[in-house]
Amino acid sequence: MEYNPTILRAVHWCRKKRIPFISWTDGTLNSEKNIGKVQRLSRSYIIKRAAAFVASSTASKQAQIAYGADEKKCFLSYLTVDIQKYLREKEDYSGRELLYVGSLIQRKGLDLLLPALAETSEDIHLTIVGEGQERELLTEQAGKLGITDRIRFLGYVEGEPLRELYHNADVFILPTREDCFGLVILEAMCASLPVIASKYADGAFDLVAEGENGYIVDPEDTHAFAEKIDQIFADENRLKEMGTRSYERAHAFAFEEVAKGCIDALCYVMGKAVR
């Protein structure tokens, strides 16, 4: 939920009318590490008065508990996409192609990925999908690192062309400095892609099973980041196994599955047995 004056008034009204309310958030301790004292107090005020809590990730749940939520009243309802639009099995992982999808802004950490890419095998390439104010700086950085010929900037892509890019890639990579969830990881998993995700993509800890369908890395450790990229491409058969595992794990994030957390929270507040 948004923590603004309107929400605070709504909470006060619910309390006055004795109407229970549910707090929902995708915020995490990482994404909210720089908020001010007043914002922290407002979060605590709301959460301590909520009848139940819905969190969009395990990290969001941990944040609500840190603000005073009762863990027994917390329910997970993951953020998701229409997975049916993206689900696609894949057989060929021989292209050695990394894919990034997202904005070209400082927060997304592409400036951390490029030095790592420069340390990897020269036959590994990167396709960057998205637009943003950092594009010129990233182009210059790639030139200085001598990897211009290993990178494609495709600009903004959506719909079926984007789904084709997912399908034609071999590994998805998200080097973000901060993301509450990282829905592009789930899109890539639906397309049977192994994933290398930043530890600052808070949803990655729910989406990526370490060593099974990908890896979670510290994007600020350039050498370790590069090693993980080389490692994931080292065995094509293993890469295919990881892609298959991504495809299988993605099904747990179908609408009907993630909605269960919201339904359970409503049932709890209404006094019914949680399924």
Predicted regions mapped to residue ranges:
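Short hydrophobic beta-strand element within catalytic cores of glycosyltransferases
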Residues: P194-S198
